[in-house]
């Protein structure tokens, strides 16, 4: 049991359908309160339905990935962790897609539709050579780009950061996604449909101690993604849609080795569950942001509250003192 379960099964139903909850629980309500709750329920659900429609709609109908006979999916960092879970989910859901996995090591997923492209994303020459290959052989068939690859430095204080590590982290976490989008996304006037997913991190918003380099690289990715998305929206681009994923801690190797505090409020996310949600968004062509777990939807709000409240929340959550020294 955690806060996500309570919100999903108690808080959100109560907020969306208060009158229905009252009827189920046989609460005694006056006529005026019942009318107000009915109007509220209709308005809030109308807004949520309209919001979902806007995120998924466009002047041109969005095609299912199943409609592309020789569709190509490009994913970085698909050999382990969340990337591997996304690859497995795509293979399970679609029999028509070929997946190009860009990683420093081969994928452990054994399938003829998965093609490994070995590349160190921190090496400029290797990235340039790979991009030339992709543009020559696959560019016009790429329907989905998932920028998932990410690395972190050792957990260390601000003064312990090294320039070489900073360069490597930013090249992989920030600059590589930009290059892949710039070189492989369709032009604004093309008819080729393409969905772009950038996997960031809630640490790019909350910026805890000892992960300054990683948090900064993800913060930069978030800013680049949002600016790019608003640019597409402003220019009326119809064939490109984007999704920003800002997860909390995942059950992967990257942040393994310590027990996260306050898991009731900040539960560790199962990568299989998150991968299924990401693939579902890809299928629907849903724009916007995917935040998991629940608290991630309020991270920006936390960073906007008065300093004293921030200190209280951060002290309670132990976000700045939970990471070990490495």
Curated annotation (Swiss-Prot):
Family: Belongs to the short-chain dehydrogenases/reductases (SDR) family.
SUPFAM superfamilies: NAD(P)-binding Rossmann-fold domains
E.C. number: 1.-.-.-
Active site: 214 (proton acceptor), 218 (lowers pka of active site tyr)
Cellular component GO terms, alphabetical: endoplasmic reticulum; mitochondrial membrane; mitochondrion
Keyword Methyltransferase: no
Gene ablation phenotype (knockout): Leads to cell death when overexpressing the camptothecin mimetic TOP1-T(722)A mutant.
Segments crossing the lipid bilayer: 9-29, 33-53
Binding positions (NADP(+)): 120, 148, 214, 218, 252
GO biological process: response to xenobiotic stimulus
Record's miscellaneous remark: Present with 2130 molecules/cell in log phase SD medium.
Taxonomic classification: Eukaryota, Fungi, Dikarya, Ascomycota, Saccharomycotina
Molecular functions (GO terms): oxidoreductase activity, acting on the CH-OH group of donors, NAD or NADP as acceptor
Function as written in the Swiss-Prot or TrEMBL entry: Involved in the resistance to DNA-damaging agents.
Chief localisation class: mitochondrion
Membrane topology of this protein: Multi-pass membrane protein
Keyword field contains DNA-binding: no
Subcellular location: Mitochondrion membrane
Superkingdom, taxonomy of origin: Eukaryota
Protein name: Uncharacterized oxidoreductase TDA5
Annotated keywords: Membrane, Mitochondrion, NADP, Oxidoreductase, Transmembrane, Transmembrane helix
């Amino acid at each position: 049991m955690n806060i996500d379960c309570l919100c999903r099964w108690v808080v959100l139903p109560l907020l969306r359908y208060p009158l229905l909850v009252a009827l189920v629980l046989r609460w005694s309500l006056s006529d005026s309160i019942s009318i107000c709750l009915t109007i509220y329920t209709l308005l809030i659900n109308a807004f949520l339905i309209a919001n979902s429609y806007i995120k998924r709609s466009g002047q041109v109908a969005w095609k299912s990935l199943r409609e592309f006979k020789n569709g190509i999916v490009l994913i970085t960092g698909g050999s382990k962790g969340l990337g591997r879970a996304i690859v497995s989910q795509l293979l399970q859901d679609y029999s028509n897609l070929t997946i190009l996995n860009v990683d420093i090591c081969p994928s452990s997923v054994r399938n003829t539709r998965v093609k490994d492209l070995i590349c160190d994303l921190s090496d400029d020459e290797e990235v340039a050579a790979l991009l030339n290959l992709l543009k020559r052989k696959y560019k016009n068939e790429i329907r989905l780009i998932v920028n998932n690859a990410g690395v972190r430095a050792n957990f260390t204080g601000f003064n312990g950061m090294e320039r070489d590590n900073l360069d490597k982290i930013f090249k992989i976490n920030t600059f590589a996604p930009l290059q892949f989008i710039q070189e492989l996304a369709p032009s604004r006037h093309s008819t080729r449909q393409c969905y772009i997913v950038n996997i960031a991190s809630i640490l790019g918003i909350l910026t805890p101690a000892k992960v300054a380099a990683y948090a900064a690289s993800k913060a930069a990715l978030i800013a680049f993604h949002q600016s790019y998305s608003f640019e597409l929206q402003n220019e009326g681009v119809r064939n490109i849609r984007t999704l920003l994923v800002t997860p909390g801690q995942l059950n992967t190797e990257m942040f393994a080795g310590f027990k996260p505090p306050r898991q009731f409020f900040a539960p560790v996310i199962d990568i299989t569950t998150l991968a299924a949600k990401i693939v579902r968004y890809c299928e629907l062509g849903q724009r916007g942001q995917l935040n998991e777990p629940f608290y991630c939807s309020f991270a920006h709000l936390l960073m906007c509250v008065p300093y004293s409240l921030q200190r209280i929340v951060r002290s309670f959550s132990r976000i700045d003192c939970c990471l070990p020294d490495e």
